[in-house]
């Protein structure tokens, strides 16, 4: 299975707490030995989250740095190469009413690159359903060996 991680799913590696559902999804990906993709735009969004946490003084910079190195240098995660088509499609989703451009880029990339987008984002899921768009989304409870083919 080839899976693109929504930003929420890279946060634990960066030392940022997430829900048990997200932790479970990451564990399942490891069990089925999925090909795991990430976007530089998720790294940017993670930095925004880190900045918010820094302001609250509940942030471990060293852990974030180690996690960032793990994501970008370990070879376990594959960096996306977004294309012109991905950005064009992301803008189309914005014009259709979905205002989160990071989500739009990730969703467009999943379509154009043939990846499943692992997310717990119900707003994105509802947008895709309401517009009759191709559903590439997968939630943690949908990860299994049967899907890894």
Sequence positions of predicted segments:
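Acidic, PIN/NYN-like endoribonuclease modules and their adjacent C-terminal/linker elements
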Residues: 78, 108-149
